[in-house]
Amino acid sequence: MIGTLLNLMLGRGLTMKRWNNFPRIEEVSHLDNLGFVIHVALFLAYLEEQKWKKIDKLFLIKRLIFASFNRLVLADINSWTREYILSLDKEIFKKLEDKALEKILELEGPENIKQDIKDTLNDDSKELELLIIEAAKKYAGYRECIINSRVYSEVYEKTFNIIKADLEKTRSKLPSLDELLSNENYEKYLSHVRGLSHSFRWIQENRQFPISVMAHLVYVTFISYIIWTLENDNGSDLVIEELLLKSIYHDIPEAITGDIITPTKRSIPGFVEILETVELKMMEDYMFEYVPEDYKNYISPYIFAPFDDELWKIAKYSDIFSALFEAKIEINNWNEAFREMYLNIKNKANSFGLISTDYLVKYWIDSFDEDKKLFV
């Protein structure tokens, strides 16, 4: 199951495009949208917590990632068609989504992960968190619609008006969304975060499956969840919420700097250290000026702290495994330029020595060679 999900996320997750039946000037993949929604949800959570409300950020991240799995199976139903179906018959679409999830969960995989997916998706008790998720999705759709409507206004007019009306209804129920929509600086900050969808990895190579830094962060976060779960089963006491926050935030500077590849970073002594200073200065100049000082202090440890404690080590392992799977999917699509990189990364992954990472290498990577067609 895990290998199949990892494969689907890099396959359909990158090839599924938002607004795919609309003319558009911006390509947004399923994973790009998911990544931005997570970042918006976490920013709204921060704003809510400034008003002394406690938000379950772990639930936000897991619910959004787990709920996206259905879309990977039901890839042919776009968002607006889905909304119309829901408006006419919620029950029948719920049955369809349940069947899609069953197709995933019936595959062989760790039972505790399957149970966590089911429990998280069935937990409707967290009303504030669910409202934040709803708001984040609408806001992400709104930002996508703004871009494309500037050129194709006659096509997007009705959709844009519907999204704006929905946002207005939601902002009356959610103070953090009202604060976001009322604060131009916050919107500028999130615009820079959204730029991660346009910062691409492996830019020195031709790719069959181009992957943005935003999509990569979602993928790393899911891998971190898997590694944590398996390690936790074997006596680890690492804090998963902190791990997932490190995973989703750690590449934010690349919205400004772009993705500088590791060989370049390590080509001469001292260059890595200079880049770290540059990242901090560019974040100050381009992004942090739009947010309060306490938000900067909150988020900075997830971005700038070195990979030297156990949580950072797991996040770094997940980052490397993401590169491994990204290279693997290229090889499987006859892109031989990635074979040497794949073998080098695999050798590195073999040296990590954790139960979870050994399991990833020995079993899950083989799922990329299997042709599992998941249809309901």
Where do the PLM segments sit?
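Alpha-helical, largely C-terminal catalytic domains
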Residues: M1-V376
